[in-house]
Every structure is written in structure tokens, then in C-alpha cells.
């Protein structure tokens, strides 16, 4: 009896027959046409009796009157005898009643495959064995981290991952996966719930209809598709965007707070007017900062309060909640201050919309450097001809011209981070590193 553990080599062959044949026809052709061809030492039946030839495995299927398949023959004879057996298979020219061809695809050395598996497993075991212990300096952080992450739970019949305050809160943040919920918990945000895939669970659909909802997905095509499906099946109030190309699970605490603070009402997303909304918010902030009266001398300055819409519960009710035994008083103060207007915040979006106002309806293209300064300005019609001469290190491009797929691909080769234009048509491949900003 042949033992599988004694296999040294496997002969892989492909067979093609001009007609419909079965597995039994292929096996019969092998034994019938090889019999007496190689001498008594390599007689197939004798090799099987001695345990040197394994079971001949045949997988065959028929299509349009022809049969195609694969043959695997395990052997435990030496290399030369295995090569002779493989070559003899190519002499078979009939299978059953049909003309056929058999070709050797490869001869696999099973021992090499086993050695490779041994090496890979040994590497994994070595990494586990040599895993370093916890740094004493990070013990406190590790304990705090575990307390936050342990609070993640599952809710509903779909068992979707969620923060501990999702059911009690009047506002929720919908993210992509469990890792995103954990990252928001690290930032002190406890009202996040994950969709876990492109199919929106019924639990989340019902929650979105009852609560103020902010969608917060990855800045890639996958996140865009999930957002589109979420908007089709339920009610969403706001959309928050991370930096284009970045995942929510990789964001720092400051980046998460900034993205949620700059959330956009869903009406502007549906009408593709995100840029217009951000520009209007900027002008309102500037106006309010000019009109705000100075407090009287000797009086205590008023505590900052955000506007009263229900959407504030997404941030103010959940993010500023003190985490027992996990967040110190100093961290709570820092967390509150994160929601105040940040005068030193990155001013790139403001610079972008300034350039948009200056380029709009002028038929020009403006190339923006990393610091927001204008590097060059050309007529929009000449941009495609002079793309090759553009200097590297550009932050973005603002152009008063319709953008198609060909022009977008050329711009992406220069490493820009954003592209502002009146419209984008025929875009089927969106580069992950570029954020498109439409304006009218």
C-alpha cells in the first residue's frame, strides 16, 4: 500500500482530448499505453504494488465537445526514474475513443516544499519566542489603553462593534470597521459604531434614523462607496472627511478631533458643494471673530460654547466625557480645548479657497506651493502643453477648466495633494493621493 508520507516528487500534467472523456478513460489510457514500454522495473502496476507510485489523481471537465484536465502522479522513486515516467506520459495519444495530448507541466520536489514550510514556521516561532517585554516607561499608557479598548461592545441582532455610549447617546458616528471604533475610543470618543463591510446592517440603519448621525469613513474609494450606500439606505446628518488617502484607524487624536469639527452637512455632500460650505464657514468664523466684544476688565472671560444644533452631541456630549481611571484631569482640559477655535491650525484650506476666488471665471490655472504661495499662473488652455516643464513639490492646482480623466492622470504624476476645478467629468480612476475640490 502506498503511503502519502513517502512521496518525494509529484508529476503535474495537463491533458486535452478531442471529445468527451471521463476520469476512468484517462487512468485506463495511462496504464494501458505505458504497459511494457519502460521495462519491468518501471511497470506502473508493479510500482504501485511496491508502494513507489501513488494514486493517480485526475480532474477533467468537458466544454464544447472537448475535454480538458489535470493529472497528478505522486512517486517515491529517484529523480531519473521520475523524469522517465513523466516523459513516458507524453507518448499517450488516445484517451478512450478520442485523440488526445498529454504534456508535463512540472515536476514538484515535495521535500523542497516541506523545507520551505519548515523555514517559514521556524521564523514565526522565533519571532514569538523573542518578543520583547513591556517597556516599564509605557506601563501606565498600556493600562489606560486597555481600559479604553475593553469598553468596545457589540449591539443589535447584527452584533456590530460599537462604543459603550452608542445606545444612550442622541448622536452617533458611523465608521467602517472595528479598528476605527477602537481608534476613536483611544481619542475618548465613545459613540462610534462600525458597519463592517459594504452591506449596511439593519441595526445601523435603524440607529441612523433615530439619532443625529455623522458618517466618518476612510479617505479612499472604499470609503466613498460605503458612504454612497449609507446615504441610499438611511438618514445621515453630517459627513466628516479624513485626509485623502488616510484611514480612520491610523489617525492621531488631534486629526480625529479636527476632522469631526470640520464635518459637512449632508445636503452639501449630496449636491457636491462641499467646497462652497467650507468657504462659507471660514467667512462666518472670520466675521464672528471681528464682532466678538472684549470682556470687561476684571470680569471672568466667558466659557466658550459651541452653537446649539443637535449635531454638537456627536462631539461635545461624547468626546469630552471624562474616562474613569483612564484620563487624567490634565487630559480632560486638553480635550475640551481641542474643540475651541485653533488659531494656529493649518491654514491650507483657507489659502485654497482664496486662490479659487481669484481664479474663478478667469480661464486661468494657478499652481500652489507647499506653503500656500502661488508658484506660477498660466492660461488654462496652455496647461496641458506645459505640464512637462512644471517644477516638482507642488501642493495643489486651481484651474478654471473642466477636468477629464486624461488631464487628472497627468496632474497625479506631479505628486499634488489637491485639485480644484469647476467640474470633473468622465472620472473612472481616482488617484488615492489627490482630493478633488469642485467649485462653481
Curated annotation (Swiss-Prot):
Residues 280-311 are annotated as: Disordered. GO terms for cellular component: cytoplasm; DNA-directed RNA polymerase complex; exosome (RNase complex); primosome complex. Keywords: DNA replication, DNA-directed RNA polymerase, Magnesium, Metal-binding, Nucleotidyltransferase, Primosome, Transcription, Transferase. Pfam families: Toprim_4 (PF13662). Residues 280-290 have a biased composition (Polar residues). Mg(2+) 1 binds at residues 176, 218. SUPFAM superfamilies: DNA primase core (SSF56731). Residues 291-300 have a biased composition (Basic and acidic residues). Residues 170-256 form the Toprim domain. GO terms for biological process: DNA replication, synthesis of primer. It catalyses: ssDNA + n NTP = ssDNA/pppN(pN)n-1 hybrid + (n-1) diphosphate. One of its GO terms (molecular function) is poly(A) binding. Its EC number is 2.7.7.101. Mg(2+) 2 binds at residues 218, 220. The keyword Transcription applies. Its cofactor is Mg(2+). Binds two Mg(2+) per subunit. HAMAP family: DNA_primase_DnaG_arc (MF_00007). PANTHER family: DNA PRIMASE (PTHR30313:SF2). Belongs to the archaeal DnaG primase family. RNA polymerase that catalyzes the synthesis of short RNA molecules used as primers for DNA polymerase during DNA replication. Forms a ternary complex with MCM helicase and DNA. This is DNA primase DnaG. The gene is dnaG.
Amino acid at each position: 500500500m502506498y503511503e502519502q508520507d513517502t512521496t518525494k516528487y509529484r508529476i503535474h500534467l495537463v491533458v486535452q482530448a478531442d471529445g468527451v472523456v471521463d476520469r476512468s478513460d484517462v487512468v485506463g489510457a495511462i496504464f494501458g499505453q505505458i504497459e511494457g514500454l519502460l521495462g519491468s522495473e518501471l511497470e506502473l502496476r508493479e510500482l504501485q504494488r511496491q508502494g513507489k507510485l501513488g494514486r493517480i489523481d485526475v480532474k477533467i471537465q468537458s466544454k464544447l465537445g472537448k475535454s480538458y484536465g489535470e493529472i497528478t502522479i505522486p512517486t517515491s522513486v529517484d529523480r531519473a526514474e521520475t523524469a522517465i515516467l513523466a516523459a513516458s506520459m507524453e507518448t499517450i495519444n488516445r484517451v478512450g475513443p478520442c485523440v488526445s495530448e498529454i504534456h508535463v507541466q512540472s515536476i514538484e520536489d515535495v521535500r523542497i516544499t516541506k523545507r520551505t514550510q519548515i523555514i517559514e514556521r521556524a521564523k514565526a516561532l522565533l519571532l514569538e519566542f523573542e518578543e520583547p517585554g513591556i517597556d516599564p516607561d509605557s506601563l501606565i499608557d498600556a493600562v489606560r489603553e486597555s481600559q479604553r479598548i475593553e469598553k468596545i461592545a457589540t449591539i443589535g441582532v447584527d452584533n456590530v462593534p460599537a462604543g459603550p455610549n452608542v445606545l444612550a447617546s442622541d448622536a452617533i458616528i458611523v465608521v467602517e470597521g472595528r479598528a476605527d471604533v477602537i481608534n476613536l475610543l483611544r481619542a475618548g470618543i465613545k459613540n462610534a459604531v462600525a458597519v463592517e463591510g459594504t452591506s449596511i446592517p439593519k441595526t445601523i440603519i435603524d440607529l441612523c434614523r433615530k439619532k443625529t448621525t455623522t458618517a466618518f469613513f476612510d479617505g479612499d474609494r472604499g470609503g466613498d462607496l460605503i458612504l454612497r450606500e449609507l446615504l441610499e439606505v438611511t438618514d445621515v446628518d453630517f459627513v466628516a472627511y479624513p485626509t485623502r488617502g488616510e484611514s480612520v484607524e491610523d489617525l492621531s487624536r488631534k486629526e480625529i478631533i479636527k476632522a469631526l469639527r470640520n464635518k459637512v452637512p449632508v445636503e452639501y455632500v449630496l449636491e457636491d458643494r462641499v467646497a462652497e460650505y467650507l468657504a462659507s464657514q471660514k467667512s462666518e468664523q472670520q466675521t464672528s471673530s471681528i464682532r466678538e466684544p472684549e470682556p470687561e476688565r476684571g470680569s471672568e472671560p466667558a466659557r466658550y460654547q459651541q452653537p446649539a444644533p443637535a449635531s454638537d452631541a456627536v462631539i461635545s456630549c461624547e468626546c469630552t466625557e471624562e474616562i474613569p481611571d483612564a484620563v487624567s484631569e490634565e487630559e480632560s482640559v486638553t480635550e475640551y480645548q481641542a474643540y475651541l477655535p485653533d488659531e494656529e491650525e493649518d491654514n491650507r484650506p483657507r489659502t485654497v479657497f482664496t486662490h479659487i476666488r481669484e481664479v474663478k471665471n478667469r480661464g486661468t490655472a494657478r499652481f500652489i506651493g507647499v506653503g500656500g504661495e502661488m508658484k506660477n499662473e498660466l492660461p488654462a488652455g496652455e496647461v496641458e502643453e506645459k505640464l512637462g516643464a512644471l517644477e516638482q513639490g507642488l501642493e495643489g492646482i486651481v484651474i478654471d477648466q473642466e477636468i477629464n480623466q486624461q488631464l487628472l492622470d497627468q496632474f497625479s504624476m506631479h505628486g499634488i495633494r489637491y485639485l480644484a476645478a469647476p467640474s470633473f467629468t468622465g472620472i473612472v480612476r481616482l488617484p488615492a493621493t489627490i482630493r478633488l475640490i469642485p467649485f462653481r
